[in-house]
Design a protein with these regions (language model features):
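Catalytic cores and adjacent flexible loops of soluble metabolic enzymes
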Residues: 1-259
């Protein structure tokens, strides 16, 4: 079993117990880098953090690009640095929110990535991942050929295509989460956070305030000291941004979690 372990603040102290326990039970421990962009985060920082995770007992490293911010050449450089720094496999987990994942994953593969995360095409793109079938086709006949059969994958695709229509029809999948939004490059909103925020605004009858909330998120994040936006910090920052917009005044209502 692969146990993917991450901390929203990239603080190794918060991972000690989880890594120790997973190792004790014989699991494959995948230590995650919560990837983000800020004045204090760069590839050297992430490489040093990955080395710390390896020393703590991680069996592989995952670049957890939850907001799809990883650009192709930055990905290439980061994977190269990680491969030079650690002796364990490197996985790329990049969401498609900003439309960069396919390009970034391809460059990451060229840089030596050992594993990449994808999703079957009916459940891909948007806040999900790049399509599995597309990557399999792109790598056929190369040194990176996956060996997967596209005809067999098409059987799996057909199954999930029906589920996709079902979930769209009953509202479990929002069409807004299926498209590419380049604004993510400015607002740094990960997939899960975007879906949660849409629900909050819908429940409050304020769906028209989405653009205002997206613009508020980087301001709230800066106020909080540039935390990577991944569970739980994404929900904490996102909820506070929603309140700031809905209340008509910044920090008129402050959540207990944000305090």
């Amino acid at each position: 079993d692969v146990i993917r372990i991450f901390d929203a603040l990239n603080d190794p102290r918060n991972l000690q117990t989880a890594i120790k326990s997973a190792n004790k039970e014989g699991a494959h421990v995948q230590g995650c880098i919560s990837y983000t962009l800020s004045p204090v985060h760069n590839n050297e920082y992430f490489a040093a953090y990955a080395k710390t995770l390896e020393e703590m007992g991680a069996n592989s490293i995952c670049i957890k690009d939850m907001a799809g911010l990883l650009t192709p050449y930055t990905c290439y450089d980061l994977v190269r640095k990680l491969k030079e720094t650690v002796s364990i496999p490197v996985d790329i987990h990049s969401h498609y929110t900003a439309g960069l994942a396919s390009m970034s994953i391809l460059k990451g593969i060229e840089a030596g990535a050992d594993i990449v995360d994808t999703a079957m095409s009916p459940l891909s793109l948007g806040t999900s991942h790049m399509p599995t079938e597309s990557l399999v086709a792109a790598l056929q006949g190369t040194d990176y050929d996956t060996g997967l059969d596209l005809k067999q994958l098409n059987v799996v695709r057909a199954y999930f295509a029906k589920l996709r229509e079902k979930y769209i029809a009953n509202g479990q999948i929002s069409p807004k989460s299926l498209g590419v939004d380049a604004n993510t490059l400015l607002y740094q909103v990960p997939g899960g956070m975007f879906s949660n925020m849409l629900k909050q605004l819908k429940d409050a009858g304020k769906e028209d305030k989405l653009d205002e909330v997206l613009a508020e998120i980087p301001r709230v994040r800066e106020d909080a000291g540039y935390p990577p936006l991944v569970t739980p910090t994404s929900q904490i920052v996102g909820t506070q941004a929603v309140f700031n917009v809905i209340m008509g005044e910044r920090y008129k209502m402050v959540t207990k979690e944000f305090k």
